Amino acid sequence: MQMIVIFIIGLILMYADMAFTSFSPMTMFSVEVYFVPKLLFMYILLLTIYAGPRISMLFAILFGVMLDVYIGSLYGIHIFGFIAFVIFMQTAFRVFYRDFVAMAFVVLLNTFLFDLYQYAVYSVLDFIAMPFFDYIALRAIPSVLVSALFFVILYVLAIQTAKVRKELRRIN
């Protein structure tokens, strides 16, 4: 049951991520600003803490493959990034424990680093032609700010998913 709930939430978040790309770029003060939150990525990171690393690794692989196939520009960038950051999240929370502020900071920092990872790979392969500081100012920082707004919603979803898991264990 928990796996089905996680999968459905993941699909909805993947769709929401894609829907946000249709709104970007937005022109603000005659400058194009990109708001691309990584809702699915943040949810997978939160699953690492609340549902366990095995479950989050499974969904990191599953949704990584789905995104790589759907986007199709470079295969492997999402699956590798998701797996690497799930491992990093698991390692980070051996140090930070489950403090909400520390967790929010680590998840948003990982979101920023994942965005930089994608930028680095795409720029090395010459798929993107945006200068680094423009990328930081016009895409990475606005995306993290929007992600921060949605973090609380994802946090509640992750906790509810963990409660489904605990309820199933208690029943069995």
Where are these regions (language model features)?
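Terminal, non-globular segments
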Residues: 1-172
